[in-house]
A protein has these predicted regions:
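Catalytic toxin/effector domains delivered as secreted proteins or via bacterial secretion systems
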Residues: 1-133
């Protein structure tokens, strides 16, 4: 399909997951998780500083973005509010773009990230335009 993005190499993924799990993190990946994420129109979801839902064979961008989100929860950047969630999404997209070379993101992932950044920035503008409610 046209929206196909290359999965993160297995060795790299296993190394990152091992480190996260050694700090008490939980990564949920299964057919059921894929179905749930599909119903939410999401590639991945971070619930808190320790819990990530990832679709099977995730892209590098998905994996790194979710780890950025766990850190945002850990540092209190994300308080769960709509506004805070949008600000965290924007910060995560910017970080992915800034470190795209280090993360070895593909051109397609960078383009998708730039699109997502624009969408989140527009959503936040709308939120403020409507009085922040």
């Amino acid at each position: 399909p046209d929206d196909y993005v290359e999965p993160m190499p297995k060795k790299q993924f296993q190394r990152i997951c091992k480190s996260f799990k050694s700090q008490g993190g939980i990564i949920q990946m299964s057919d059921a998780t894929d179905e749930y994420l599909s119903s939410k129109h999401a590639e991945a979801i971070t619930y808190d500083s320790k819990t990530i839902l990832l679709k099977q064979n995730p892209s590098r961008a998905s994996v790194f973005e979710e780890f950025i989100h766990t850190h945002q929860y850990k540092t209190g950047e994300n308080d769960g509010s709509y506004e805070s969630r949008l600000k965290c999404e924007i910060a995560a997209q910017k970080k992915l773009i800034k470190y795209s070379k280090a993360y070895k993101l593909t051109d397609k992932e960078i383009t998708q990230t730039q699109r997502a950044l624009e969408a989140y920035e527009n959503e936040l503008k709308e939120y403020y335009k409507n009085g922040g409610a």
